[in-house]
């Protein structure tokens, strides 16, 4: 008897890949990828708020534990089959890259640099994802694709540099490492989601991390939580539920449908969504330069999409 798709994961969450309609799959991939990027855009501002009151290592382990418990409940409730023996190693790579590596390295980096400073490195994430898509996913974008990808990354980095950056070698190194492990985790997860399913990949990766994250989070927990403010708790909830789980459901599905290198270029928009979010929450002014660069980056994303295959 065929397994019925759970209603909770209908719409963009469903496995909708159709080999008979690659154009529809590509469009769905870009839609799912865009939703994922919007969700991820709140990650750095939320992490910045949370790390002011939570120790970075504990924050990383706690968010992974909370998301992992929820992921385990979903897998049990929907009676998902266990991954095959060949799929466990890629799941470990995903867990090390996006469940532990990127959250931990960014949390540590944000002790040294501001969210605006980190835009320089987030601007390199689409390029890193595309490179690992070639190395791990076997993709072969056309040469013009790389031109648009590098140009888009340069625009984002140039805009961030124009805002003024302070010297923080430790923070810079941590952010660079975060981008590399995240790009690997994105590409590996997207490749695996073609056979395992988008939401299943991130759920199993979170479950893989539980035996480490759960006991360590209990060991490193502070003696009391009485001094933690409501914004810090809300930030923890966001990075645990949205950044660690829901965002990846859309993101991995989008990468699998539309191509790792191609859909990965949507990440060029993430810094600007993050700045817009900061402006809305913190009432910071959005400059004309930000608007102009955003338009130019959208053009690079469109160009990359056209020449991705």
Where does each model-flagged region fall?
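C-terminal-most transmembrane helix of multi-pass membrane proteins
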Residues: 15-22, 62-64, 232-234, 268-309
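Transmembrane alpha-helical segments that form core, pore/gating elements
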Residues: 71, 129-131, 135, 149, ...
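Membrane-interface helix-cap regions at the ends of transmembrane helices
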Residues: 42, 46-49, 53, 67-84, ...
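Specific transmembrane alpha-helical segments of multi-pass solute transporters/efflux pumps
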Residues: 38-39, 43-44, 72-122, 158, ...
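Helix-helix packing/entry segments at the starts of transmembrane helices
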Residues: 61-62, 103, 117-124, 188-211, ...
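Glycine-/small-residue-enriched transmembrane alpha-helix faces in small-molecule transporters
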Residues: 2-61, 104, 108, 164-191, ...
